[in-house]
UniProtKB/Swiss-Prot annotation:
Its EC number is 1.18.1.-. The keyword Repressor does not apply. It holds the Pfam family Rbx_binding. This is Nitric oxide reductase FlRd-NAD(+) reductase. Belongs to the FAD-dependent oxidoreductase family.
Length: 388
């Protein structure tokens, strides 16, 4: 177990990481591969247990209990990686002048600090919003696991990537599921409506009721008695569970409190350095080159680059074209590159079980693509053709 180590100048050599999600743990692993002795401290408000977050979209079809999702306990992870772990230790603030992390268990000096504070599920502001359920962590799932098991009528608010996955999963054992979105089609931030038609058909064939072009206005009722939901178009229905899947909002409170530059996320440069030269950020909380990147591959690549930077070899983050996977088993999708824009010309090949759609710019160059259904094997050859 590591202990705080002081340099000759009296400044801690310890790399302190706040958070224990995928980004934090991936960074620890990357650091350890490069340096077996570097002192590392992980501070987290939860247990620090490792689990696979994408599994949260498939808990019904896989019969997955919350406790069974744990791959490795926080204490075992700390022992394996030879780090100091402070579980169940909320961080109260950061003092960047004295280079201290302030917690309920004391003050901890750092040589370099990494914020891996993640993002929280967005909750809409409407009457009864406290009755909404979110599934953005193992802890959130554990809190509502019983309610999910008992629910027969479920409304999923938000038809983005996670909402579509959840709706198909929740309907996999015959439940009455409604998928609701203000947009006119699912995955509206990712794809033109035409390319989502096969997915819509697959959702309907699973028994999902698609309600587009309308939103949620209010939720009324009492726990245990079901919920009466009212839509913005005035229609009402009775539901046992209402799940919010309308996106994530980076957790910025600690960064703001420390005076770091933030916009939608914590602003970082190419080396994932914040506006403070001794503080870095990684994962869902980060805004890099104007983008939020709440996907696993950018985190893995970011952790590898940041580990080298923290250990003395400044390494900019470079992201190649990356696949986004929509894990809807009845009609899976993979996409990459630029897939939205009125200037795109689409060339589509369809069959009864799948599609390949290529997006080309005004010069006729491939700039994005979508593959669906039984055409998954076309993804990697197209990915290699995208400009880097």
């Amino acid at each position: 177990m590591s202990t705080t180590t002081q340099s000759d100048a009296g400044i801690s050599r310890e790399i302190v990481v706040i958070g224990s999600g995928f980004a934090a743990q991936q960074l620890v692993k990357s650091l350890r591969k490069l340096d077996a002795e570097q002192p590392i401290r992980l501070i987290t408000a939860d247990s620090g247990d490792e689990y696979n977050k994408p599994d949260l979209s498939h808990v019904v079809s896989r019969g997955c209990a919350a406790a069974a999702m744990t791959r490795q306990s926080g204490s075992d992870f700390a022992e394996q990686q030879r780090i100091a772990l402070l579980p169940h230790c909320p961080v109260l603030g950061i003092d960047p002048v004295r280079r201290l992390v302030l917690t309920e268990q004391g003050e901890f000096p750092y040589g370099q600090l990494v914020l891996a504070t993640g993002a929280s599920a967005v909750r809409p502001e409407l009457p009864g919003s406290e009755h909404l359920v979110t599934l953005n962590s193992q802890q959130e799932y554990a809190a509502v696991e019983g309610a999910i098991q008992q629910a027969r009528r479920i409304l999923v608010l938000g038809a983005g990537l996670i909402g579509c996955e959840l709706a198909m999963d929740m309907a996999s054992d015959g439940r009455e599921v409604t998928l609701l979105d203000l947009a006119d089609s699912p995955l509206s931030a990712l794809l033109p409506a035409t390319l989502t038609q096969p997915l819509q058909q697959a959702l309907r064939s699973q028994g999902v009721s698609l309600q587009f072009g309308t939103g949620l206005a209010r939720i009324d009722g009492q726990p245990g008695d079901g919920w009466r939901v009212t839509l913005t178009d005035g229609r009402t229905s009775e539901q046992d569970l209402v799940i919010a899947a309308i996106g994530l909002r980076p957790n910025l409170a600690l960064a703001r409190g420390a005076g770091l530059a933030v916009e939608r996320g914590i602003l970082v440069g190419d080396r994932l350095q914040t506006s403070d030269p001794h503080i870095f950020a990684l994962g869902d909380c980060v805004q890099w080159q104007g983008q939020l990147l709440p996907f696993l591959q950018p985190i893995v690549l970011g952790a590898n680059a940041l580990a080298r930077t923290l250990l003395g070899t400044p390494t900019p983050l470079a992201l190649p074209p990356m696949l986004v996977k929509v894990k809807t088993p009845r009609y899976p999708l993979q996409l990459a590159g630029r897939t939205q824009g009125e200037d795109l010309a689409w060339q589509c090949r369809w069959n009864s079980h799948g599609m390949v759609a290529e997006a080309r710019d005004q010069a006729g160059e491939l700039c994005g693509f979508v593959v669906g259904g039984d055409q998954m094997s076309a993804a990697f050859p197209l990915l290699r053709q995208l400009p880097r």
